[in-house]
């Protein structure tokens, strides 16, 4: 009689801005799946995101040749009938992850021996990495005989700067006049005890919190 295949759950991991590819019997989803009759006859016939609808996987396909793609929460999985797969993490979907934080994408694949089938999960752990902050140019104005001071998130230089991980963690670390040398801005400072640099028409004092006076 035909014995049912035994499908074993698989796991993998990737950073939020990376791609993983697994091929061959040592790495793909069929590596640890077995069939008492003939394990070499096993193929992947269907794939879906956990909770979603099944998509057929074409016979004879590989991850990079006629493979079937399924979009998860944090990336896209493409899998072949031979069990090979690639997972491309979606940077925009995972941007909210702080460095070191993890989330999972779970996919359910169907294994067939040609007669009967079993299902197993492929769980991809997506790990957040530190994202580069986005700094936006700022402008201000002052009369030639006056002083301006800007403090708080509505006025200082960090107001419109962002970080996908945590904008609240942003701080000013250095300041320099155009064409001049860079000066370090000490951690925890404000404009009142910050770093001063002299420009062509005045002196700017800025703190790590983004507040400044000119």
Task: List each model region and its residues.
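Acidic/polar, solvent-exposed loop/turn segments
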Residues: 1-213
């Amino acid at each position: 009689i035909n014995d049912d295949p035994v499908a074993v759950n698989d796991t993998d991991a990737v950073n939020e801005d990376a791609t993983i590819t697994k091929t061959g019997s040592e790495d793909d989803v069929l590596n640890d799946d077995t069939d008492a009759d003939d394990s070499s006859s096993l193929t992947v016939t269907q794939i879906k995101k956990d909770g979603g609808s099944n998509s057929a996987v074409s016979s004879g396909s590989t991850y990079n040749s006629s493979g079937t793609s399924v979009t998860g929460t944090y990336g896209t999985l493409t899998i072949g009938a031979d069990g090979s797969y690639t997972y491309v993490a979606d940077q925009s979907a995972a941007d909210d992850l702080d460095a070191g934080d993890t989330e999972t994408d779970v996919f359910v694949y169907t294994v067939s021996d040609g007669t009967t089938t079993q299902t197993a999960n492929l769980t991809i752990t997506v790990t957040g990495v530190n994202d580069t902050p986005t700094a936006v140019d700022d402008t201000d104005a002052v009369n030639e005989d006056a002083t301006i001071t800007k403090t708080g998130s509505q006025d200082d230089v960090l107001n419109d700067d962002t970080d996908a991980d945590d904008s609240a963690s942003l701080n000013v670390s250095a300041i320099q006049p155009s064409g001049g040398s860079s000066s370090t801005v000490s951690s925890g400072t404000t404009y009142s005890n910050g770093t001063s640099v002299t420009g062509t028409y005045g002196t700017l004092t800025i703190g790590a919190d983004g507040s400044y006076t000119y």
